[in-house]
Amino acid sequence: MLFRSLSTGIPAATVLDSLTRLQPVRGRLERAVLTRAGAPVYVDYAHTPDALAAAIAALRPHVSGKLIVVFGAGGDRDTGKRPDMGRVAAEQADVAIVTDDNPRGEDAGEIRAAILAGCGDNEIIEIPGRREAIAKAVMIAGKGDIVLIAGKGHEQGQIVGRGEDMRVLPFDDVIVASECAGEMP
């Protein structure tokens, strides 16, 4: 981009000034907060096995400790991907925490069970409440660790129920991670 801009005659100072104002895309490897231990917490929309693997791969080179991943799978959606999501997290994360992510009209426990079925013999932490799962990840993250909260990204609600009973409960992974980091002793 820089070379192309300069080759069109745009002054270098103008190009560099524009670059300083670039903003990251909300919910795509968005750095939410640093834990008190100094571990960065990232939020990403990764809600498929390939996207989860890509997000983990993008962060892995920057981890000197553990890569802690919080994730789930949406209800009333592609049920076949759930075991694959579990397999990816179990194989590629150092600590995987399975939680709820827009269960909609499905039983959240059954969604988590389908994810866990793909984890093999790997030890996985299951925490139903998304806020509690994020709090656990933030709490256990130490120096050199990175936390990835995957699945919701830019979304600002947790979808539960279906039809007339459907509700969207306020929930923002970035805000929750910041709150959890602020509540740490």
Segments predicted by a language model, with ranges:
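ATP-dependent carboxylate-amine ligase
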Residues: 3-185
